[in-house]
Amino acid sequence: LLGNLTPAIVVVVILYIPALVLATISIVRKRMLSAAFIRRERKRAFVVFGVSLLSLAGAYVQDPGYELKSDLYPLNVCYNVGLAFQRTALTQNYHHTSKDFTFHAQATHPEEKQEVYVMVVGETSRALNWQLYGYERETNPLLVQQSGLVAFPKVLTESNTTHKSVPMLLSDVTACSYDSIYHRKGIITAFKEAGFRTAFFSNQRFNHSFIDFFGREADTFDFIKEDSLDFSYNPSDNELLKLVEQELAKGAKKQFIVLHTYGSHFNYRERYPSGDAFFTPDYPVEAERKFRDNLVNAYDNSVRY
């Protein structure tokens, strides 16, 4: 997929590199602009500035929510850089700011009743490609046969990025209250307070942020990609099931297990064994229009698997 960035990179290099080189040469040789050039360009600058002010006024009229700090370049760049530094500092201080947080959670079911809850956090699984939600292909053949299954067809994510959406799934934080995440803990802590033995198993690497923080709240946690020194190690999500079996074998009366899968991230063909390809052909899968059908087949195979 990143190969499609090449044309954009080439254009940027052609536009900016020669200009930067010429500017550097002019500075080194101390070339001076003529007075006539300065007067002419100054007039043009005032015209551009006037047009910019009118455009800015138009933006405020059309969109009452328009903000200079977030919508006007390069002010938004400066704002976002500052915001990144601020959030990095808050993240690094998370363990201190959240240490006294509690849900005050209590179990309401009898202690002798065995309860096992498994929460699966998937990724990049498009609802429109789920048989369960009306997709014409058999991408969920086992789920549709499951009795007592409740599906929610009209659900929207609160973020389109993993580093925000997953922490919100693992806690009671919402998009509107996201800044409170620095002072709160996750659902695993709530279950621990209620007397459950907890486990968190992930098929992703550390991200040094809230997914790690919430996962490490569990009595047992394992980020299986970190178990190998080989950075190219790319296990299938079904490897997590082995850890689930081991956890269930411990025989605790109350268990809460969270699985964070790698889901259907590209390259799709790496998400399932070649022998389990149901929709074919699923190769080649380069991100090109002529391979669209192959890409869809491979993606649907990843959802099905």
Language-model-detected regions and their locations in the chain:
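Active-site-proximal alpha/beta segments of enzymes that process anionic O-linked groups
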Residues: S52-M119, T124-E286
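A long, amphipathic alpha-helix that forms part
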Residues: K242-Q246, Y283-Y305
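A broad, structural surface signal
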Residues: A19-L22, T189, K242, R304
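Transmembrane and membrane-interface helices of multi-pass
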Residues: L1-L75
